[in-house]
Amino acid sequence: MYRYKITIEYLGTDLAGWQRQAGVMSVQQILEEAIYKFSGEQVILFGSGRTDAGVHAVGQVAHFDLSKYLEPHKIITAINYFARPYAVGVWNCELAPNNFHARFSATSRYYIYRIINRPCPSVIDLNRAWWISSPLDVPAMQQAAAYLLGKHDFTSFRASSCQSKSPIKTLTELNIIKEDEEIKLYLSAPSFLHHMVRNIVGSLVLVGKNIWQAEQIKDVLEAKDRKAAGPTAPASGLYFVKAAY
């Protein structure tokens, strides 16, 4: 068997997320069907991160096995041809060791969350960022973010449907940068809880609106109660950037 590692980008707006689900179109299904059309083999695609409906990716990593060797550049061309007309594309393909696993071999995952912060919405960024019309206090958000760095029990920022065995995670990066009318939040960790990034963003926005003081984020973290945290930020602003190995 030959194991292939592919890197994928997609717009999640009209998709049901990464994972295959009955009755809806997912990234996994689109790619698995595309691979079958040119290889004749039913494969199972394993992704480095299972993004939700509406979440985008610029560097999602996945792997699959084929019984015969195909040149990686031909695999890229074939997948992109058969994945049409969906907003899903493969931009890299390479052979990987048989013990490589896109999910379990990953040592870190990186996300970006985009906020458009101006009085009028951005037509260009429709469904690609969270539009917030009122000015956000970015320094206060940065101060609050510092409380979340490191190893913590992130139960307060965990979705009720989360299947992770432990709420203990290590947030290695949480940077907030304002560039003109756009605010970007950069987050990285070895792994994340379900909705963890979006729940963190939703809570930091409450700080940015001066509804909460920055210090309240520490109280939310220590509460270990989802009801203590802010709302879940929209999926449209979230991007899976890359996985490190």
From Swiss-Prot:
Query: Could you name the active-site residues?
Result: D52
Under the heading InterPro entries, the entry gives:
PsdUridine_synth_cat_dom_sf, PsdUridine_synth_TruA, PsdUridine_synth_TruA_a/b_dom, PsdUridine_synth_TruA_C, TruA/RsuA/RluB/E/F_N
Give one GO biological process term. tRNA pseudouridine synthesis
Reaction catalysed by this chain? uridine(38/39/40) in tRNA = pseudouridine(38/39/40) in tRNA
UniProt keyword list? Isomerase, tRNA processing
UniProt xrefs under Pfam families: PseudoU_synth_1 (PF01416)
Instruction: List the GO molecular function terms.
Output: RNA binding; tRNA pseudouridine(38-40) synthase activity
Q: Does the keyword Isomerase apply?
A: yes
Work out whether the entry's keyword set contains tRNA processing: yes
Entry superkingdom: Bacteria
Query: What is the E.C. number?
Result: 5.4.99.12
Q: Where does substrate bind?
A: Y111
How does the record describe its quaternary structure?
Answer: Homodimer.
List, alphabetically, the PANTHER family matched: PSEUDOURIDYLATE SYNTHASE (PTHR11142), TRNA PSEUDOURIDINE SYNTHASE-LIKE 1 (PTHR11142:SF0)
Protein purpose: Formation of pseudouridine at positions 38, 39 and 40 in the anticodon stem and loop of transfer RNAs.
What the record says about family reads: Belongs to the tRNA pseudouridine synthase TruA family.
Q: What is this protein called?
A: tRNA pseudouridine synthase A
User: What species was this sequence derived from?
Assistant: Rickettsia peacockii (strain Rustic)
